[in-house]
Amino acid sequence: MTPLYLQDVTLRDGMHAIAHRYTVDQVRTIAAALDAAGIAAIEVAHGDGLAGSSVNYGHGAASDAEWIAAAAEVLTTARLTTLLVPGIGTIADLKAARALGVTSVRIATHCTEADISAQHIGWARENGMDVSGFLMMAHMNDPVDLAAQAKLMESYGAHCVYVTDSGGRLLMSDVAERIDAYRQVLEPETQIGIHAHHNLSLGVANSVVAVEHGRILGDGPLGTPVGRTVRVDASLAGQGAGAGNAPLEVFVAVAELHGWEHGCDVFALMDAAEDVVRPLQDRPVRVDRETLSLGYAGVYSSFLRHAERAAERYGVDVRSILVELGRRQMVGGQEDMIVDVALDLAGKEET
């Protein structure tokens, strides 16, 4: 089987879990531990990507440049990567990151808006970067239409396109259908990626399904030993928005049991998760009534802490806020609507 490409997101998606408050020294320590453990790629940025530090998304404890430079100092084998959301980050931000040593980038859009990634993907490809398309909130688009969006990203120059389960809402069958749809339209050399969240406790299971279906070329049956590279996102101790991402150390252990080539030291990952990352969590990254509600309602995982603050301020149940956000089909970038929803619910309770 073609080796897996494991990308750690502790230092990007994991920012959401601690309100973007990693210090430069913590970034350096975590990046060094991941590099030593053999991870292929390490993503570094504000939780909402380059230039995400703001009133709307939350201010970072340091700048993207400071975090990226800290990681670059300690990496010896891992690829330094970042993420950019068009409309938040710009090509100028990407140029600055590249100058600091970033060689790979994911361009992230809502699952129906691939067309806004054309300029950014094109620039990255033309300038020698590894570049992926990152179709967020993948549960909000059916498999065929999502695959059509992936094909657009491929046409702009993406080396890989992800099924991005930002809400942790996809079931295993949903992942299989979307990965299979990608296989039908993408060229054999284009890689397929999975970015799972653990809100329904399916982060690892969904990643396994993505590997099983994504590594096949064309219409071969499951188990066909021919391969396309599958990229899998995960994070130490699951550090990420909502109930977190697929826990890296758990996924690697499962990959080992499957006999998949991954290149990582599972014990070193366990140690980094337990000794370095988990002590940083001011709110446990786990499935609980609030994070389960994210997956149940299909809500953008990074809404969690915003919703918890609004619930406390206006005296409403955070689950009610999350379910209503899901009903209204709010997506990333609409964080300002969380307070509106909380006020609406508080008003109804008073009448």
From Swiss-Prot:
Q: Active site at which residues?
A: 16
Which of this chain's residues are annotated to bind Mn(2+)?
13, 195, 197
Which family does the entry's similarity section mention?
Belongs to the 4-hydroxy-2-oxovalerate aldolase family.
The superkingdom listed in its UniProt entry is Bacteria
**Biological processes annotated in GO:** catabolic process; L-leucine biosynthetic process
Domain Pyruvate carboxyltransferase, residue spans: 4-258
Annotated substrate binding sites: 12-13, 166, 195, 300
EC no.?
4.1.3.39
Substrates-to-products reaction catalysed: (S)-4-hydroxy-2-oxopentanoate = acetaldehyde + pyruvate
Q: Which GO terms describe its molecular function?
A: 2-isopropylmalate synthase activity; 4-hydroxy-2-oxovalerate aldolase activity; manganese ion binding
Q: What is this protein called?
A: 4-hydroxy-2-oxovalerate aldolase
Q: What class of enzyme is it?
A: lyase
What transmembrane ranges does the database entry give? none
Check the record and name the InterPro entries matching this protein: 2-IPM_HCS-like, 4OH_2_O-val_aldolase, Aldolase_TIM, DmpG_comm, DRE_TIM_HOA, PYR_CT
